[in-house]
Swiss-Prot record:
EC number: 3.4.24.63
Residue span, Peptidase M12A domain: 63-257
Activity control summary: Strongly inhibited by fetuin-A/AHSG. Inhibited by cysteine and by the metal ion chelators EDTA and 1,10-phenanthroline.
EGF-like domain: residues covered: 607-647
Subcellular location: Cell membrane; Secreted
A Pfam entry, by short name: MATH_2
Native species: Mus musculus
Cofactor list: Zn(2+)
Cystine pairings recorded for this chain: 104-256, 125-145, 266-428, 611-622, 616-631, 633-646
Protein name: Meprin A subunit beta
Residue ranges listed under propeptide: 21-64
Length: 704
């Protein structure tokens, strides 16, 4: 049955927010057990003794510099092994989409390539660093590792990244408190010089997804890492998303000049309005402004916080007659994937009958003006705030996105405004949960917030529960609820992955750090009483009442009490204009449960590790350059090692002695040369003088 066929009470309740009704503790299941475990906590709890906590070293135990030979191709083959949990498989595929959106790195199912990444459920979360040319290169996403930022972290290792705090200039930015580190774990805080870990001339990054947290390997309750800038104390160790510097380094390392699935972003700060054009076939124009008397008072990008900046596009319907239109068209865009997601913010200060139409103008051979296709009509009641919208597109040819403002009937005191447009070749979220006046809700005591009811694409009704009762963390849970389609659906609910994303409202989608969590409905999972956890809500749930008085059944919630800390929630642009957005997607991932046919590997010769036969002395590190093993020798401020195997020691004192000796030697040689030259010259002139004297004597003799 179509998921949009909802009973009247759900339609009515869609716009309602239930708050102040705490869920019974026993009616939610916390997948984290109330503990926010980092990668290193998980691995240590399993008794793993990995290099730096989550790195699997090569067989010879050596660390080598990341050079061209350690890089992967831009499209990396992978296999999702059958051992992986279903939720982990879906999370990994979502992580790949983050790489595609922000880098030129792509991933494809393995089809026999010589080297590929095998992702499996091992013990803990770990990876090797770089392409080790082993054929099948393992990367473990074990129990509790199925968080998207954890997957991003481990794949960054596989792509060649070390941990941020191990770089050579680490001590300029953080202080390692050695006596707070667990005995025997001190080596996890080693520094590696530039010959091992290349910072690519990018500043130290407190916000890196590759940085240890302040509590890494602690032997008590106090921090093992103290940031020299105190404001970053609770920032290090974030596991939300790539930082800007993570992306800068990754794109430099792999020579990325553009992102794969990103298409366009526009906040209208520049006068060229991102290459957009005003159509000639309309009766009015969109205007670039910084405020409108009737609203909005500021743009959405900067919220009026920056003087002489903060612009948006406005269609003034108050001065136009009914039926007037204004069309704003994007620059030409060239799709590659066949599906796109358009995102923008809309502010209506005009009439409730004013309308925004979203078109695509697709160009084909022989059609100069393109084919105009209506994608969405948006008509909303003016509520005095910016509203987020998503529009799914499916364009396969060269196209433009067209924003058409239409003056409707009735009185208007303002018009339509748009801002912060993003277009990418990604999937749009299925639903948006918009929570207004959030700081007031967040400041309340014993507060819980329920979302409106939603439907998945398969027809399952669900609701999200946000737990705000903790003074330190915010929790989030997914509930199945009774809906119009329950008689036609399969129960227990099989393999639906619910992804809940707290939106970072940065104007540019590439610079956002999303906070996201996914859970999957396992039809075999049981509750403590033996009933199926994801069975029909009317069978295993409890009865509740919507604000309009209509009863419904709510199943057990599944999620986490440590979705995000309150401190992180107040960072970035999660809360903007006192609004937050939770993006919701529920998709069927049952196809990931089947075993894919695995091709036979391409026959290859075993890769010879040239460093296996080279022993570098005095702490030197073996590297492979152009297929040859070389020793990179350590050096200090006034000393260094040199030689084929770093067997010779040098120092500035030796250099001074050599320089002085060389100078004296050169001076002595030059002096000798000068003396010899003078001697030879004088001897030459003496001979010439004697010859002249003899000639004069002979002439005198002939005269007589």
């Amino acid at each position: 049955m179509d998921a949009r066929h909802q009973p009247w009470f759900l339609v009515f309740a869609t716009f309602l927010l239930v708050s102040g009704l705490p869920a019974p503790e026993k009616f939610v299941k916390d997948i984290d057990g109330g503990i926010d475990q980092d990668i290193f906590d998980i691995n240590q709890g399993l008794g793993l003794d990995l290099f730096e906590g989550d790195i699997k070293l090569e067989a010879n135990g050596k660390n080598s510099i990341i050079g061209d030979h350690k890089r992967w191709p831009h499209t990396i083959p992978y296999v999702l092994e059958d051992s992986l949990e279903m939720n982990a498989k879906g999370v990994i595929l979502n992580a790949f989409e983050r790489y595609r959106l922000k880098t030129c790195i792509d991933f494809k199912p393995w089809s026999g390539e010589a080297n590929y990444i095998s992702v499996f459920k091992g013990s803990g979360c770990w990876s090797s660093v770089g392409n080790i040319h082993a054929g099948k290169q393992e990367l473990s996403i074990g129990t509790n590792c199925d968080r998207i930022a954890t997957v991003q972290h481990e794949f960054l290792h596989a792509l060649g990244f070390w941990h941020e705090q191990s770089r050579a200039d680490r001590d300029d930015y953080v202080i390692i408190v050695w006596d707070r580190i667990q005995p025997g774990k001190e080596h996890n805080f080693n520094i590696y010089n530039d010959s091992v870990s290349d910072s690519l001339n990018v500043p130290y990054d407190y916000t890196s997804v590759m940085h240890y947290s302040k509590t890494a390997f602690q032997n008590g309750t106090e921090s093992t890492i103290v940031t020299r800038i105190s404001e970053f104390e609770d920032v290090i160790g974030q596991r939300m998303d790539f930082s800007d510097y993570d992306l800068l380094k990754l794109n430099q390392l792999y020579n990325c000049t553009s992102s794969l699935s990103f298409m366009d972003s526009c906040d209208f700060e520049l006068e060229n309005i991102c290459g957009m054009i005003q159509s000639s076939g309309d009766s009015a124009d969109w205007q670039r402004v910084s405020q409108v008397l009737s609203g909005p008072e500021s743009d959405h990008s900067k919220m009026g916080q920056c003087k002489d900046s903060g612009f948006f596009m406005h269609f003034n319907t108050s001065i136009l007659n009914e039926g007037a239109t204004a069309m704003l068209e994007s620059r030409l865009l060239y799709p590659k994937r066949g599906f796109q997601c358009l995102e923008f913010y809309l502010y209506n200060s005009g009439s409730g009958n004013d309308q925004l139409n979203i078109y695509t103008r697709e160009y084909t051979t022989g059609q100069q003006g393109g084919v105009l296709t209506l994608q969405r009509q948006i008509k909303e009641v003016p509520i005095g705030s910016w509203q987020l919208h998503y529009v799914t597109l499916q364009v396969t040819k060269k196209f433009r996105v067209v924003f058409e403002g239409l003056r409707g009937p009735g009185t208007s005191s303002g018009g339509l405004s748009i801002d912060d447009i993003n277009l990418s070749e990604t999937r749009c979220p299925h639903h948006i949960w918009h929570i207004q006046n959030f700081t007031q809700i967040l400041g309340g005591q014993d507060t819980s917030v329920y979302s409106p009811p939603f439907y998945s694409s398969k027809g399952y009704a669900f609701q999200i529960y946000m737990d705000l009762r903790s003074s330190t963390n915010v929790g989030i849970y997914f509930h199945l609820i009774s809906g119009a389609n329950d008689d036609q659906l399969q129960w227990p609910c099989p393999w639906q992955q619910a992804t809940m994303t707290l939106l970072d409202q940065n104007p540019d989608i590439r610079q956002r750090m999303f906070n996201q969590r996914s859970i999957t409905t396992d039809p075999t999972m049981t509750s403590d009483n033996g009933s199926y956890f994801w069975d029909r809500p009317s069978k295993v749930g409890v009865t509740d009442v919507f604000p309009n008085g209509t009863q419904f059944s709510r199943g057990i919630g599944y999620g986490t009490t440590v979705f995000i800390t309150r401190e992180r929630l107040k960072s970035r642009e999660f809360i903007k204009g006192d609004d937050i957005y939770i993006l919701l997607t529920v998709e069927d991932i049952s196809h990931l449960n089947s075993t894919s046919a695995v091709p036979d590997p391409v026959p290859t010769l075993a890769v010879h590790n040239a460093c296996s036969e080279v022993v570098c002395q005095n702490g030197g590190i073996c590297v492979v350059q152009d297929g040859r093993a070389e020793c990179k020798c350590p050096a200090g401020e006034d000393w260094w090692y040199m030689g084929k195997r770093c067997e010779k020691r040098g120092s500035t004192r030796d250099t001074v002695i050599i320089a002085v000796s060389s100078t004296v030697t050169v001076f002595a040689v030059m002096l000798i040369i000068t003396l010899v030259s003078v001697y030879c010259t004088r001897r030459k002139y003496r001979k010439k003088a004697r010859a002249n004297t003899a000639a004069m004597t002979l002439e005198n003799q002939h005269a007589f």
